[in-house]
A protein has these predicted regions:
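Long, contiguous binding/interaction regions
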Residues: 13-39, 43-76, 81-196
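Tryptophan (W) side chains
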Residues: 4-6
Length: 196
């Protein structure tokens, strides 16, 4: 049974676990991000089943990408980024593994070093000095100009989500007009590979 008490009677009531709280109780509530790679049959309805698993149980999808990965086009790789407690993430992986067309499920965040990248197209509308500043920042971030008019640029940029966020935030005061992002793709470093 949980004990609750006021820490200071002069302050508003804030419940907290008293002396009988265990480390496992605290770990159960810690949230973490997980990058999960799923190898599936490339057939109609598979993506809907994966999304249904998340939405039906109230799990959030932070990022989702999917594409065929073999020459024959029979396998697709789904990369899902989600956030939850360790127990929730383990439950997600177990439920994904039970779906019929799933060949393999891997939590890349736990299986060792991995690479994660996103692609973004970023439209900036500006004139004069802000336009030059946008070009300087794009050069510093290694963003490519893929379209330019007298009043706008479209930059193409690849990198970590944090790098893209930083560039986008710097473009806001300059004249950020629109952003389109792919979502995260990820792969393990070294010799390990996601195989059926």
């Amino acid at each position: 049974m949980r004990e609750w008490r006021w820490s200071d009677p002069g302050q508003p009531f804030t419940p907290f676990r008293a002396r009988n709280a265990s480390m496992s109780d605290l770990i159960e509530t810690a949230q973490r991000a997980a990058t999960i790679a799923v190898l599936v049959e490339n057939e109609a309805g598979v993506l809907a089943r994966v999304i249904g698993l998340f939405s039906g149980r109230g799990y959030n999808i932070d990022s989702l990408t999917v594409a065929p990965v073999d020459e024959a086009g029979r396998l697709s790789r789904i990369t899902v980024v989600t956030t939850g407690t360790e127990m929730v993430i383990e439950q997600i992986k177990a439920q994904l593994d039970r779906l019929v067309p799933v060949h393999k499920v891997a939590d890349l965040t736990l299986e060792g070093p991995h690479l994660t990248r996103e692609l973004a197209l970023i439209k900036v509308v500006s004139r004069g000095e802000p336009r030059q500043e946008a070009l300087r920042l794009a050069d510093a971030f290694r963003a490519r100009v893929v379209d330019a008019t007298t009043e706008s640029f479209v930059f193409e940029m690849t990198g970590s989500g944090e790098k893209l966020d930083a560039f986008i935030n710097l473009m806001r005061p300059i004249g950020l007009a629109e952003v389109s992002r792919t979502g995260a793709v990820a792969i393990a470093r070294g010799t390990s590979a996601l195989q059926p």
